[in-house]
């Protein structure tokens, strides 16, 4: 509620309003809503497993030329890992080459594909932020790989204070009382707060 209530105020602080966020989870959509902006990212309403997200980001332009297809939940290479979640099997799973995309907030594959293709056409490659976090079995090794990617404007959020701070620029430890294993999307920062100033980062793109 707070995220959307102050959206108009945050929007006035923005100088760049045509940015793209490539996120490993639903954070991108939350950010566009928090600024009351059109969604300029295909990763809205979906999530990637860590290895697939890193693979996708490393060669994103090639992956986005591939035809998005869909598989049954039992065909997912992550079926055993995700089957314990009650929502597994209720959402479409997309496939771009060897990368799986979990379209968590979509009801059908057709809906997911239409919005994916439409938003791919909105990507602003000159103003792109890549956001990763500690969800879905992410390890410190994954974080090292993320900050080693040949891309600019990287953000990483974690609740793990014991993890080594891989990078002084873009690595943020977030306090969270609930769920001690990984950060929840609702706890990831937006706007300007005590962790960092996203508005400032966007304006500097």
Summary of predicted features, one role per range:
Residues 23-25, 105-107, 129-136, 158-160:
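Structural motif
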């Amino acid at each position: 509620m707070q995220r959307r209530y102050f959206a108009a105020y945050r929007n006035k602080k923005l100088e760049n309003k045509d940015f793209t966020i490539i996120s490993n989870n639903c954070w991108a959509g939350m950010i566009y809503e928090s600024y009351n902006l059109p969604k300029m990212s295909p990763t809205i309403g979906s999530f990637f497993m860590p290895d697939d997200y890193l693979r996708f980001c490393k060669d994103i332009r090639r992956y986005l030329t591939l035809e998005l297809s869909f598989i049954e939940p039992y065909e997912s290479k992550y079926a055993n890992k995700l089957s314990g979640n009650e929502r597994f099997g209720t959402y479409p799973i997309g496939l771009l080459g060897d990368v799986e995309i979990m379209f968590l907030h979509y009801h059908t594959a057709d809906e997911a594909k239409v919005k994916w293709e439409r938003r791919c056409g909105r990507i602003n490659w000159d103003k792109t932020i890549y956001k990763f976090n500690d969800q879905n079995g992410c390890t410190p090794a994954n974080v090292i790989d993320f900050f080693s990617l040949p891309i600019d404007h990287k953000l990483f959020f974690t609740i793990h204070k014991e993890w080594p701070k891989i990078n002084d620029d873009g690595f943020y430890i977030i306090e969270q009382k609930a769920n001690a294993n990984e950060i929840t999307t609702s706890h990831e920062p937006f706007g300007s707060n005590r962790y960092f100033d996203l508005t400032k980062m966007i304006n500097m793109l």
